[in-house]
């Protein structure tokens, strides 16, 4: 993690360049704004990550409950809002100066992203997509606790089979937000409107999708509580060690 964080500014410069071509003073300004965001994040966000990781480890030691998962979800979403708002504030003045050709370049890249989303999440029949969902959840859990038992894998499989597929809704919601952002940029109103729009990405979401997401979250959190109850001592030690290492990494990065 430390290596990735220390090189995040380089990645952001490369990523931004895949959306819009900036030259000369504009490219220099982008570099300065990325550096400013990275410095802000190190100073303001990382210390909060340290506290969150330590609190999560304490809660995990006592056994996960639904309130614990709600706390973690709300805390992470709050941190995401702060970061994307700051990023939008820094990017907005540059976005307001883009030419129509540059805005069109961003739109084309978003269309490419949407085609990739379709390949990643909408390809295949329902059975294939549910199998892919089960593998994704299994892989993420094993990142934290190590190899799952057969009983735990069966719990994941049952969850993947039971829950509705939301990817079509996700695709529509992505396009909704993209359209709103592009409209703000075209109107040259990024400074006035973009930070609030980005930080509240769920506003304007289809109410049916919002309800489906809440149902998914309820079922997923129940799966996590059930898996937690079945963890072996070794699995629990591994997960606790991961949380502790995250806290140590965040603390070391914040101190630089």
Task: Describe the predicted segments one by one.
Residues 35, 96, 146, 222-225, ...:
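Extended, non-membrane alpha-helical segments enriched in charged/polar residues
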Residues 37-41, 114-117, 164-167, 247-250:
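A short hydrophobic/aromatic micro-motif that marks alpha-helical segments and, especially, helix-coil
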């Amino acid at each position: 993690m430390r290596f990735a964080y220390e090189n995040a500014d380089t990645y952001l410069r490369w990523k931004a360049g895949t959306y819009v071509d900036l030259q000369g003073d504009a490219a220099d300004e982008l570099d300065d704004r990325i550096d400013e965001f990275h410095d802000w994040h190190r100073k303001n966000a990382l210390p909060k990550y340290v506290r969150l990781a330590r609190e999560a480890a304490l809660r995990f030691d006592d056994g996960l409950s639904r309130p614990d998962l709600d706390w973690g979800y709300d805390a992470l979403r709050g941190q995401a809002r702060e970061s994307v708002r700051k990023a939008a504030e820094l990017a907005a003045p540059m976005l307001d100066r883009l030419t129509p050709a540059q805005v069109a370049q961003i739109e084309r890249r978003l269309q490419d992203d949407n085609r990739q989303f379709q390949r990643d999440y909408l390809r295949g029949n329902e059975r294939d997509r549910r199998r892919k969902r089960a593998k994704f959840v299994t892989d993420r859990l094993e990142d934290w606790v190590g190899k799952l038992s057969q009983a735990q894998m069966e719990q994941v499989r049952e969850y993947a089979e039971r829950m509705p597929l939301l990817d079509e809704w996700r695709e529509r919601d992505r396009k909704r937000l993209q359209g709103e952002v592009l409209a703000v940029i075209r109107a040259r109103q990024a400074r006035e409107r973009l930070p609030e729009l980005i930080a509240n990405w769920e506003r304007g979401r289809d109410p049916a999708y919002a309800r489906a997401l809440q149902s998914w979250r309820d079922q997923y959190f129940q799966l996590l509580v059930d898996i937690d109850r079945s963890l072996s001592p070794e699995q629990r030690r591994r997960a606790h060690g991961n949380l502790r290492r995250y806290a140590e990494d965040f603390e070391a990065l914040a101190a630089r």
